């Protein structure tokens, strides 16, 4: 049973916001009020449907005492009772605290781990997988920075993904992705194991955090292509070091001005994510063990090419659909991760 007093508080807050916006709130308040109103609206729709179902059930049960209406009530009551548990579950999910970052664009960083050139090739495969997934969702996928490897893989890549639910769905991808397959360079047909690391960060705006200029060291250098050769003769590449944390961000596109923009965009995202992690750790030590914690050192998934199998180790999910997954069909695994995370947060909220 969902506490009715809490539901009524939400409805009253929604009605207050609606009245303020209709009356013409102060310009400085409109954005915050509109955002809260939009967040509460689907919850209020669920509450309204739930209250209507309870009222219908109460009316049907009252009809049992009327001999003329008893048969009709006995027909209606089972269906009404069957609907209510599902509506209560939908309400519980709607009442879960929202992650303020879920509505933001995502910054995606991919780097090869152990495994040499094969790891770089796999990192490139992951980048294409996410690009296809984003395109399938109707999101905008923008490659911010790419350092290719000698054989067509990547030494590192940074992308920005924008669209409804981009960070909310991609955030579960942070961690170590392991691949087991026969590399193209393997003459004897032996299976090799290598890995790549994925970091998914919510994009941060300048208003989210202030970065004093004194905290930054900005260096320029020549851009390098595959194999380390210089791709131009100007010092266009930019490396920004955040001195208090030691975080280093580089960008090596052709325009130095654009490289500064990209590097600052990624640095803001990393610092914002660092603060989010600090607050999450302070709220609950248990939260780190949950699916969406974003621990970049955690091995989250194995892609076994000989068996056509993908296993997500966090939720013990195995799918024999590896070609489709590598082609960008991530919906099933991300939906399973979302459901698992919701269940864990529900259990935490109701404990």
UniProtKB/Swiss-Prot annotation:
Q: Give the location in the cell.
A: Cytoplasm
Pfam entry (one): PCRF
Q: Which InterPro entries match?
A: PCRF (IPR005139), Pep_chain_release_fac_I (IPR000352), Pep_chain_release_fac_I_sf (IPR045853), Prokaryotic/Mito_RF (IPR050057), RF-1 (IPR004373)
Q: Name one GO molecular function term.
A: translation release factor activity, codon specific
Q: In which broad location class does this protein mainly occur, judging by the first location in its UniProt entry?
A: cytoplasm
Cellular component terms (Gene Ontology): cytoplasm
Q: Which PANTHER family match?
A: LD18447P
What does the function comment of this entry state? Peptide chain release factor 1 directs the termination of translation in response to the peptide chain termination codons UAG and UAA.
Question: What is the recorded name of this protein?
Answer: Peptide chain release factor 1
- State which gene encodes it: prfA
